């Protein structure tokens, strides 16, 4: 059984890099939502067997893109039979701006997990909020609900700040660890 799964949509490659960091931190399987908002049929079984699931999506125009929302709506067949009841969930999002209304995307993911009767894991990392803080610091965007990432709009995925990627790794490891503890 795969203990942790990262399911994500990436429009321009930035979220894919973040999802890979999350998978590394959680030692998780990766499931990519395609450009039509679908996942492979076998991926549904992988999600069903997981102890913990991390959602990932960019924030476009103040929320998740339609491809992630289509996936979220497709989970209703799991909701109907309470397939994901008591699973552990977390989520991450990125946008080009430091704020970019990313919190809305995390709240959507949190709500989706709650609809399924899941247990949402907070970030659990103190913010880097002193005058000496930099973008290389852990949780330099000051998140608490989940992981936030800023991806420069004029650069490729390699330009994502190291502090953001490390924050995602640590958070994903926390989600997976709590999933293992609750389902031991």
From Swiss-Prot:
Cofactor requirements of the protein: FMN
UniProt entry keywords in alphabetical sequence: Electron transport, Flavoprotein, FMN, Stress response, Transport
Binding residue positions for FMN: 10-14, 91-147
Disulfide bonds: none
GO cellular component, one term: membrane
SUPFAM superfamilies: Flavoproteins
Phenotype seen when the gene is deleted: Cells lacking this gene accumulate higher intracellular ROS levels and exhibit decreased tolerance to H(2)O(2) toxicity compared to wild-type siblings. Inactivation of this gene also produces a moderate but significant decrease of 24% in the intracellular survival of P.aeruginosa in phagocytic cells. During in vivo infection of Drosophila melanogaster, flies that have been fed with the wild-type strain of P.aeruginosa die faster than those fed with the fldP deletion mutant.
Protein name, as recorded: Flavodoxin FldP
